[in-house]
Structures are given as C-alpha cells and as structure tokens.
C-alpha cells in the first residue's frame, strides 16, 4: 500500500484521528498532525504495538469465567389448557469458559465424590433447573432428556475431561466472577475456540450413536405430535445442546438419571404417575338449573355449563328463534333445560324476601306492650291542641318542652299504663302505612269539633280506620264553647255507621276540651281500656321489627329515620333494613332527645346510620349480616325501578289521548281541591254534567284545603288531573309533582275549569272524517311515457284538480281504482293545480289501465270538529 496521511489512515481503519495520533505516539512514533505521511514501516510498528497490547489484555484476563442465569415461567400440565394444572418452572443455566493454560493445573485436581441421587415423592409444584456447563465441544444427547457431557480439555483422555468437570464444580462453589462483563465473555469465547484444538475422532465417536438416537426420537415425537397422537411430555426452554435437570422444590428430583444409561423402571412409573390426562365421564352430568321469571340465553347456557350456541340450537329445534342476549320467559327456559337433560328449579319472584324471613331470628318471650294511638280529624278541629295538651301535662318533671318536635311520635307514661302517640297531621303517613300493609296503629282517636260537626276529612278518617280494621274512639272537642252541640255530632256520625255506646253501638264517645283540659284523663282511660280489650302483646327477645314513621335528612347527622318498634328489641350496632335502605345503627335517640342503647316494642326512636332516607310506612327489620341486607335492598330497588318504568307515562291534559284506547270506555279522572265546601260541590256538579255516552268525568277525590302529598299520590295512581280552586300545593306536594311530572292546574273562576275540562273531553271524542270532491277530469286520450307510464290527457270539467291528492278512477260510474295523483302537467310544465275548462296531463301512481272516457275524481279528506 502507498504512503497515506494520518487522516486517510484513520478513515480506512474507522477510528477518530485523535485516537490514531495517540496510538502512534504510544508506539514511539512522532506524529502530531493529521496531514503527516505514514509509510509501510511505521504501519508495521503500529500494528505490532497494537497486537502486544491485545496479548497483555488477554493474559490479564481471568483464567475461568462462570456465567449463571435463572429464569421463571409457568407450564400447564394436563389434557387441555383449561382443565390442566399450572406448575412453576425455574430454569437455571451455567456456562464456564476456561483458558488453555489453566487446563494442566485442573488435571491434577482429584475428582470429588458425588453423593447418590435420592428419590423423593412428587409434589404439586415442581422446579425445573437446567445446569448448563458448556464449552466449544458439542453436547451429548439421549433419547428422552438431554444430558451434557463435561467440558473437553486439551488432553485427549476421558479422565482429564472428568477432572476438568470436577474442577468446574469446585470453582462453582467459590462463585468466581459471577457477574462477568458480557463483551469480555464474547471475546474470550473466540479466543478459547481458537486455542483449544480437539481431535475430531474423539469428538465424534462418543456422540454419533446418542445424537443419532436423539434425532430419530425427536423426529418421531414431532411427527406424532403433529398428527395429534402424542402430547409433549415437557416444555423445552433452551436448545438441545443444554443440560436440563428436573428438581422438586425443597429437594432433589426423581427424574434425574445417570449419564449414558436408559431410563429406569422407577423413572417410567413416576412419569406415568405424573402424566395428567382427562377421562371422559361414564355418565351424563345432570345439573339443577335455577330459573328465574326471566333469563337471557347466555345466562341459561352458563348455568348449564354449555355454550350458548347449543342452547340456541335446541331452541331452533323446538321452533323458537333466539339470540344470545335475548330474554326468554320461565316456561321456555324450563322446556329448554328439560330438553337438554337437566333438572329445572323454578325461582319465585319473592324468593329473596322469603329468604329474609327465614334468616330473621324469631323470639319466644312475649310481654304486654303499650297501645299505639293515631289521632285523626278534620282541619281546625283541635287535633294539634289535644296533642299539645297531652304533651305538656304528661311529660316528666324537668323535661317540659323537651319533646323533639320533629320526631312525629312520642311515648307517654300514666299511672295506669304507657301510651304511644303518632303525630300524623293529615292522613298521608297513615295511608302509606295501610297501603304497605304495616298495621302500626292499634287505636284511632277521631277528633270532631262540637260546633262544626262531621266534615269530609272526618269521613275520610273513618273510612281509613274501617279499612285498617282499627277500633275508633271519638273525642268530641271544643265542649267549652257555648255553641257546642254533641248530639248533632253523634247524629252525623251515626250516618257513617259510627254508633255510640249510649245508643247501643260499640264506639266510645268522650267529651273533651283541649283548651281547658276537660275530659283528657277520661280519654286516656278509654284508650287504656280499649288496649286491655285488645290484649296487645309482642315478642321482646327476638330480632327487632318495626315501621318507619317518618324520615328526614339532617345536615349534621345524615339520614335520620323515626322507627316505631313493633316486636323484638332494637339495639345499637344492629344491621337494620328499612325498605330500599340499610345500614348499621350508629345511634338511637329517644322521643325526648336522649341517647339510648335499645328500644323495645311500641317505643319510637330515631335511628342514625342508614344509607339513605327510607319512605314513611316502610317496614324496618333487623337482619343477621350486612350482606343479606344489601342483597334484599338491591332486589327491592330493582323491582321498584321496573314498576316505575312500567307506569312511566305522564299524566297531563295533553297526554290523555295517548292513554286511551278505542275499545275502552273513556273516563277522565279528576282530583279536585277547593277552598270552601260550597265551591267544591258546585264544581263537582258542573263537571259531572259534562259527561256523555262516549266520555265521562269522574271526580275520584274532592276535598277542602290545600293540595297535599297524598293528593299527588292519588293522582299518580289513578291517572287523574289535579285541579286546585283558590288553593295551592304545599312544598312537599310540589316537589313530588315535579319529580313524577304531574301537572297541577290552578283556577280562580269556575267557568274556566268547566271550559278546560270540556276541551279535554272534546279531544277524547273519536274523530270523524268527511270526503269532499274538489274536481273531476275526463280522460280524452292516453299517452305512454317511459318514466311514468300511462299519461291521461284530460279536460277538467268540474272544480280544481290538485297534485298529490287522492283520486278515484271511474269507468261507467263505477270506481275501478283508488290511488294518488302523482303527475300533473300542462304543456310539459309541472303545475300544482289545473282549474275547470283547462286541459292537462295526469299520471296516476301505480296504475296504467287508464282508457279514454274514464273520469278521474279528485277528493280531499276533511276532519269534522266535534263538540259535546
């Protein structure tokens, strides 16, 4: 090669110029500039210098390098990937690299004594350890498991090979150079491969037979595995050149076999024992399939442990088409389950509720309890005054005014016994409790003003009490007034079938005055006497059961529910289920505001700790655990949601038509509230007179006073219009009406109510239609059009012919076709209408049999407005 500059030489070698200059200076050559020329002699000196430094690096390298690696994996052993057992596999690999100069020293080391292999019983989880001792020589293989020969040494004798292998094991215990640099290892591999010449004869002779056998065995295994005849007995993680050794976790493996020998009988037995397989069941598996009222095809297939496609096939064979997400009924599910050979078990809708009743612990100890009294009556008849007087006079000393005003129930102790009063202004709570079947009230006190007599709400209270089959005690209030007339009250109540005992009936009448306190003690005595007749008793030692009187959301304490315990004892810390809500009782507050630890029958308490606010009238019960409470609460919420969605249609005057069907008699329900009784009767009579044979007006509820929550509930349940005459709805009723999308109509003039209801009834009448002929055209000639078909050339002889109107084709005054006028042209121009005396071309939609002389009659359908 010709002389080159330092820069050109650096480009040829592929290193930076600065590095080449440093190497030239280290070699003893004086080069300082990249433009200096380098001759052949200087290149040779540089090359010898670089080779010398490389040899020094190699001689300074360690004589032995051992590399260890460990990897973890999992293997599924069994018939398939789903039913097999997963075992953990640990693969240990070791590679030892030895310099040539170290071999003679290792040959002098004696061979260590190898302890015998101890076989241990199999465990569920095994660890696979592959100790790999590899050199440049090829590896020896056997038929089943690869076993690697020791490292080949420079000497050509087998003894020296074994000594070298022993020395490797000894060096392994010393853990020399475990974390060697990977680049150095690769360089040393190249050096060792060049430095260790191995005789071809000795390299090939011991491996020809075993390697050939192994290849034949491997080929046969692969062919059988591809054909599906044979499963692989183990997973291979490395090449066949590596030694693999199976170990049990915590002990030696029973799979380890001696080198150069065949598998022993014990090894074969152990392998057969550990071979996982799947045995087909000898008899079909019959399952009990739980079937609710509705279930999807996918869920039904899952419960039978089959694929959804199988269920769909069975349903198709039975003549029913279904998709995987389709909901099928209980009867269809039973037929499908029986067809597939399983046993159906029908689940009832209230199975969760039934299970709740079974889970509640029943008590055995019964004791007498205090009566629960509800005071009802008409507005301004003294109900609140009576409650205030009893509260003021019967509260224990030092607790005057200590009754919590929000609780809605309180307990009164008298010398003759205890009484629990429910403060239920109006009838909303009582109605809700009776509707939910919660018979919380034992006695009803009916308050009637002696100077006012029986009023509509008084009659309503009597109806509620009779429907609940609760005894009534009549308290004639305001006896201190000069115009008090108790005889008039008794006469009016006898009309409602409330007969006093003095007249031979079974109802006690007590004359009282809530203002002066006259007759209050007699009223309490009558209550206790009536309770003795009823023989009220309750279980005291079982799980508590009661009813929610009212509930509210307290800003500082969260949901607070007033619960009247009916049986059992409610303790602090119990799991309470109340309607849709549940929770652990965090605190119990009595009616006078004190914290208590428990509450027995007929005792009202405030409960803190529920998840949300329950409804008034909900049943409250103590359940054994929170899981059961959550299950029942979620079930009730789902059922309530379904019912709510089922009646999702709104109640408005505009939507009445949507709720009516042609086959049903059309009735307009009205809930009416007015300010005075006279106006109420006048409006009711005027609306009732609007009824005809086709539509009727039915006032399902009417009363004097403001619109309450119970009125809104009644309007929702009966699909009625809520009308208020000179009255307004309270806050609770407004919120409920907005929540349920019920419109409340306010009026101040009676005639406005009559006109509005008359318009609603008019809209409910069945519509009537009339056909009016607007024009007649006579066909003079027929033309053919490639786009439309037959075109009738006509003369309008009467009226106006309009496009897109319905038409009739008459031939000899007989209707032969009825359709729509599709095309209307005059002098090739599309027109909307053609009047009498003009010619036009008419195209009839989907009809081509038009002939000269036919008449085309154009008409319109007009709806006739109906009035009452």
From Swiss-Prot:
What biological function has been recorded for the protein in this entry? Answer: One of the essential components for the initiation of protein synthesis. Protects formylmethionyl-tRNA from spontaneous hydrolysis and promotes its binding to the 30S ribosomal subunits. Also involved in the hydrolysis of GTP during the formation of the 70S ribosomal complex.
* Region entry G3, spans: 423-426
**Residues given in the record as GTP binding sites:** 377-384, 423-427, 477-480
**Does the record carry Nucleotide-binding as a key word?**
yes
Enumerate the subcellular locations listed in this protein's record, separating them with semicolons. Answer: Cytoplasm
Q: Which UniProt keywords apply?
A: Cytoplasm, GTP-binding, Initiation factor, Nucleotide-binding, Protein biosynthesis
**Could you tell me which residues belong to the region G1?**
377-384
CDD domains, per the entry: IF2_eIF5B, IF2_mtIF2_II, mtIF2_IVc
Q: Which InterPro entries would you find in this protein's record?
A: DNA-bd_dom_put_sf, EF-G-like_DII, EFTu-like_2, IF2_assoc_dom_bac, IF2_II, IF2_N, P-loop_NTPase, Small_GTP-bd
Organism annotation: Legionella pneumophila (strain Lens)
This entry's Gene Ontology molecular function terms read: GTP binding; GTPase activity; guanosine tetraphosphate binding; translation initiation factor activity
Protein's UniProt name = Translation initiation factor IF-2
Q: Could you confirm whether the keyword GTP-binding appears in this record?
A: yes
GO cellular component terms, alphabetically, are:
cytosol
Q: Where is this region: G2?
A: 402-406
Give me the ranges of the annotated region G4. 477-480
**So which residues are the signal peptide here?**
none
The record's region (Disordered) falls at 158-178, 200-269
Q: Positions of the region G5?
A: 513-515
């Amino acid at each position: 090669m010709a002389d080159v500059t330092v820069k050109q030489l650096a480009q040829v070698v592929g290193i930076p110029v600065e590095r080449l200059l440093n190497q030239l200076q280290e070699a003893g050559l004086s080069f300082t500039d990249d433009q200096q020329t380098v001759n052949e002699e200087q290149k040779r000196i540089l090359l010898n210098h670089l080779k010398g430094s490389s040899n020094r690096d190699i001689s300074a390298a360690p004589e032995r390098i051992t590399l260890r690696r460990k990897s973890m994996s999992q293997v599924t052993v069994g018939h398939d990937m789903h039913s097999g057992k997963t075992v953990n596999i640990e693969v240990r690999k070791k590679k030892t690299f030895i310099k040539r100069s170290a071999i003679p020293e290792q040959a002098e080391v004696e061979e260590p004594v190898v302890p015998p292999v101890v076989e241990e019983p199999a465990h569920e989880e095994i660890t696979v350890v592959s100790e790999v001792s590899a050199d440049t020589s090829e590896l020896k293989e056997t038929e089943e498991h690869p076993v690697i020969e020791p490292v080949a040494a420079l000497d050509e004798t087998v003894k020296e090979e074994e000594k070298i292998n022993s020395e490797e094991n000894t060096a392994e215990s010393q853990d020399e150079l475990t974390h060697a640099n990977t680049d150095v290892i690769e360089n040393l591999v190249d050096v060792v491969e060049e430095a260790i010449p191995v005789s071809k004869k000795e390299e090939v002779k011991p491996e020809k037979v075993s390697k050939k056998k192994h290849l034949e065995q491997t080929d046969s295994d692969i062919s059988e595995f591809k054909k599906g005849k044979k499963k692989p007995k183990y997973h291979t993680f490395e090449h066949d050149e590596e030694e693999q050794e199976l170990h049990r976790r915590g002990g030696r493996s029973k799979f380890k076999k001696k080198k150069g020998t065949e598998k022993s009988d014990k090894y074969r037995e152990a392998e057969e024992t550990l071979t996982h397989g799947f045995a087909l069941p000898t008899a079909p598996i019959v399952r009990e399939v739980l079937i609710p009222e509705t279930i999807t095809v996918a869920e039904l297939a899952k419960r039978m442990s089959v694929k959804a496609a199988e269920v769909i096939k069975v349903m198709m064979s039975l003549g029913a088409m279904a998709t995987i997400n389709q909901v099928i009924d209980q009867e269809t599910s039973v037929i499908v389950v029986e067809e597939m050979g399983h046993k159906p078990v029908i689940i009832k809708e209230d199975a969760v509720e039934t299970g709740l009743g079974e889970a509640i612990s029943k008590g055995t100890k019964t004791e007498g309890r205090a009566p629960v009294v509800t005071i009802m009556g008409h507005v301004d008849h003294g109900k609140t005054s009576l409650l205030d007087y009893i509260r003021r006079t019967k509260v224990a000393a030092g607790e005057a005014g200590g009754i919590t005003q929000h609780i809605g129930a309180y307990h009164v102790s008298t010398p003759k016994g205890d009484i629990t009063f429910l403060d239920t202004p109006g009838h909303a709570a009582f109605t809700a409790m009776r509707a939910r079947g919660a018979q919380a009230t034992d006695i009803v006190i009916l308050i009637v003003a002696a100077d006012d007599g029986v009023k509509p709400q008084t009659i309503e209270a009597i109806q509620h009490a009779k429907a609940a089959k609760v005894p009534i005690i009549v308290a004639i209030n305001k006896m201190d007034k000069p115009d008090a007339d108790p005889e008039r009250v008794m006469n009016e109540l006898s009309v409602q079938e409330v007969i006093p005992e003095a007249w031979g009936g079974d109802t006690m009448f007590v004359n009282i005055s809530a203002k002066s306190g006259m007759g209050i003690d007699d009223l309490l005595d009558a209550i206790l006497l009536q309770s003795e007749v009823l023989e009220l008793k309750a279980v005291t030692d079982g799980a508590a059961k009661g009813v929610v009187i009212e509930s509210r959301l307290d800003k500082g304490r969260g949901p607070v529910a007033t619960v009247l315990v009916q049986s059992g004892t409610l303790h602090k810390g119990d799991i309470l289920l109340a309607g849709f809500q549940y929770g652990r009782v965090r605190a119990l507050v009595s009616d006078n505001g004190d914290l208590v630890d428990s509450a027995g029958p007929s005792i009202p308490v405030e409960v803190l700790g529920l998840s949300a606010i329950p409804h008034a009238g909900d049943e409250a019960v103590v359940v054994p655990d929170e899981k059961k409470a959550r299950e029942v609460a979620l079930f009730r919420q789902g059922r309530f949601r379904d019912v709510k969605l089922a009646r999702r249609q709104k109640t408005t005057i505009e939507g009445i038509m949507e709720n009516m069907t042609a086959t049903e008699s059309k009735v307009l329900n009205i809930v009416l509230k007015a300010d005075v009784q006279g106006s109420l009767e006048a409006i009711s009579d005027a609306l009732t007179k609007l009824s005809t044979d086709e539509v009727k007006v039915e006032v399902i509820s009417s009363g004097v006073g403001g619109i309450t929550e119970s009125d809104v509930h009644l309007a929702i349940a009966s699909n009625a219009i809520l009308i208020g005459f000179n009255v307004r709805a309270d806050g609770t009723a407004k919120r409920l009406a907005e929540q349920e999308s019920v419109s409340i109509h306010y009026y101040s003039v009676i005639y406005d109510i009559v006109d509005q209801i008359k318009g609603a009834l008019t809209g409910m009448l069945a519509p009537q239609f009339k056909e009016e002929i607007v024009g007649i055209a006579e066909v003079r000639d027929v033309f053919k059009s490639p786009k439309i078909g037959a075109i009738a050339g006509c003369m309008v002889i009467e009226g106006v012919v309009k496009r897109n109107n319905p038409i009739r084709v008459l031939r000899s005054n007989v209707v032969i076709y009825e359709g729509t006028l599709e095309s209307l042209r005059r002098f090739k121009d599309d027109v909307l209408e053609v009047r009498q005396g003009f010619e036009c071309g008419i195209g009839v939609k989907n009809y081509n049999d038009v002939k000269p002389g036919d008449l085309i009659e154009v008409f319109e359908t007009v709806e006739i407005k109906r009035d009452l």
